[in-house]
Amino acid sequence: MNILSSVGSFGFLTLISRVLGYFRDILIAIFLGTSFLADAFFVAFRLPNTFRRLFAEGSFNSAFVPQYSKLDIKKKAFEFANSVFNLLIFFLFVLVCVAEVFMGGVIYIISPGFIENPEKYNLAVTLSRIAFPFLLFVSLSSFYSAILNTKGRFAVAAAAPIILNLLLIASIFYAKFFDKELVYFMAWAVTLAGILQLIMLAIYAKKYFTPKISFNFKISSEVKHFFKRLLPSIFSSGVMQINILVGTVIASFQTSAVSYLYYADRIYQLPLAITGIAIGTVILPSLSKEIFQNKDGKNFFLQNRSIELSLFLSAPATVGIIMATEPIISTLFGYGSFDQESIRQTSKALFVFGFGLPAFSLLKIYSSFYFARGNTKFPFYVSVLTVIINILISIILFNRLGFVSIALGTTISCWCAILIYQFFLLTNGMHKFDKTFIARVSKIFVCSFIMSAVLSFLLFKFQFAFEHGSIHKIFSLTVIVGISALIYFLLSILFKSFSIKDFKVKNYDTK
């Protein structure tokens, strides 16, 4: 398998989804801004969407792929997958039914501050009831994605979330054109998108797996092992999403804070699509195979190149976000109901999140190093510690910094997790930095530093352009980003801080 090609296709399609997600969010910003309607919808959307990210971008793959990859007998692999599929249907259906009945309590738990505004609280409950069945469909979609990933078919799984964003965009236009209640149509679009994603992935995975629905459960040792690993995987793979959910709980006590954090989150998620999620997802099947075959040399090579690639992509994105925070928010969201105060407050959160971008990217990759070895316990413990650190920082500093403390807690806690992961990888002989890694990472930092000087000059030259209309802002930001990125990549070629040929490795036969 060509790792770079797989990362490229997965990352590109994920990036397309994120760009469509941005377009969706700019429409929401124009029509809803940071109003109580926006807060209510974001809470309702965040609940099932958090589960989507938990399953689709980490935990299910982490528990399923290594286990499924080891079963080289076709019949045994089918029995394992079929049992998992049927159990998922049963448990998820029960979970959705229970949540629908007790949704009022669920919203009180995740957004306790909403109770002070009955209209906002009741709207959030109603919208959540409409959108929550998405969880059932997206979780089953993740099952099919995992099947496809074990066969080296990453593109379809990456393309599936595009459906969600297209339907949400369509629902916004439909509601505005026919003068309907916007937030209700958006909530229904979420559930419909889940159904369509599931149908699409089931069709593409049919070649490799067609389930036999049966509730006469046969729980083999492999199935027990899978579910034993799944819960720790959910927590450890989804630590970023859990941190965001924790942030939503705390932010609900400050007016519009949920919206500020949501919009800031959407910006750094764009580069994160490639710098962490794509690399971590693609590297897991390869690494699982090599570890199963006891090829330590190749393990270390794959791990070093994965970290390199993540830093190569996240370093310039980090510099750009930190230095151009307000121009980015103003250009991407500063229209309609999204006023100057919204721009200023959202920029504060994005600035702090920017310092955490490399850690957010590496988190997915480092946890994959453990998951590939069948170790879900250690990432689970690290994730628990990470969430505790995040909660403590967010609560302690909330009175002084407001919602910014939530961004700070997320950033610091994720960097702590990276340091812990790396320390134990080195001390347990599961990783060794090679000379190539040290040389290239040093060059990446040099290239990023030079790019920051160029970016600073460009921001100074274009500073007044962001005070004008949308055309001026979009043109100026495009020029600034384009020139800065070009300088960075030219410097990278000059200093040889990245090598494409290292990723053209045939790791295993995916057919």
Language-model segments: residues:
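Membrane-embedded alpha-helical bundles of multi-pass transporters/translocases
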Residues: 1-511
